[in-house]
Regions:
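Glycine/proline-rich active-site loop of Rossmann-fold NAD(P)-dependent oxidoreductases
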Residues: 138, 150-153, 163-173, 183, ...
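A conserved pocket-lining segment of Rossmann-fold NAD(P)-dependent short-chain dehydrogenase/reductase
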Residues: 173-193
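Conserved C-terminal active-site "lid" loop/helix of NAD(P)H-dependent oxidoreductases
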Residues: 230, 250-273
């Protein structure tokens, strides 16, 4: 297949490398100047473009068979999200409308679920987020689903949980820096997925995803905050994080949610088997790599 990866960053670059390894022709689109050696080593043909600009895709071929939009925002404001995700998606749909790919996969986020009661959510659950950035992501999903209905655009949506892996993992990094805290009784649920499994889920969606469908990309074991930090403390022989201050939630830029995201549909319909089915297996691998590289803080 001739593939286009829109957003060759933390997920997109290794995704492109894996697709190239599988024998596909891979193009990688990035807003900023690319590091030629990095792309060449991954087997990716670079293309510099800005999907937020009216003519930003000029010169890009129309004949891709698989397209993945896994672009990431460079800033956290709702307006920046709107520019990158919503406006960018609109231009991609317009660009490929005359000659659609066989499959178009968009990586959205489980933040579109605004539940705060610890309930289990699936793809048909209510999406009513309080965070402005999550509202933009939901609006982007709806734009894409409209194109599916009205134009038969072959799009599949993956709602991706908090990604961790090499150099990434917000709660893990906070723990290592002694900046983590436990909220209340620690019962708030954390939903995670290793980067390798994000890549695996995207490829499964390209192969088996049905246009117009949404799939939650999250590991098998959403975990309470207390359980997660107790495990880390035991593995790394460190103290537990302190209790969060009373005004902790008020100081967060993003809304605080508490939900248990189900991956049942993704596993059943896409047939994907997780490399790291829970946080223990994933973080055991990450901790080992840090130890071997001498990068694990004392």
């Amino acid at each position: 297949m001739k593939c286009l990866i829109v957003g060759c960053g933390y997920v997109g670059l290794p995704l492109g490398a894996e697709l190239a390894r599988l024998g596909h022709e891979v193009w990688g689109l990035r807003r900023s100047a690319v590091v030629e050696d990095e792309f060449k080593a991954a087997g990716i043909r670079p293309f510099v473009a800005d999907i937020t600009k009216p003519d930003g895709l000029a010169g890009l071929p129309h004949d891709f068979e698989w397209v993945v939009n896994c672009i990431a925002s460079s800033g956290g404001s709702a307006e920046n999200y709107r520019r990158i995700y919503l406006h960018g998606m609109s231009r991609l749909i317009e660009w490929f409308s005359a000659s659609p790919p066989k499959k178009f996969v968009y990586t959205s986020s489980t933040s579109v679920y605004g539940q705060t009661d610890g309930s289990t959510v699936k793809e048909t659950s209510l999406t009513a987020p309080s965070a402005e950035t999550a509202k933009v992501l939901l609006e982007t999903e709806r734009l894409l689903l409209t194109a599916v209905r009205e134009q038969k655009f072959p799009a599949v949506i993956l709602r991706v949980a908090a990604i961790y892996g090499p150099g990434r993992g917000v709660w893990f990094k906070q723990f290592l820096k002694n900046e983590a805290c436990i909220e209340g009784d620690g019962s708030r649920i954390l939903n995670m997925i290793h980067r390798d499994d994000v890549i695996g889920c995207i490829i499964a969606a390209l192969r088996n995803g049905r246009p117009g469908e949404i799939y939650n990309a999250v590991d098998d074991e959403p975990v309470s905050q207390a359980t997660f930090f107790h495990w880390l403390a035991g593995e790394l022989r460190r103290d537990l994080p302190p209790a969060a201050p009373e005004n902790w939630a008020e100081n967060r830029k993003r809304g605080v949610t508490n939900k248990r995201v189900s991956n049942r549909k993704l596993k059943m319909e896409l047939g994907y088997q997780f490399k790291y089915p829970d946080f223990r297996s994933g973080y055991t691998a990450e901790i080992l790599q840090l130890e071997q590289a001498g990068k694990l803080p004392e």
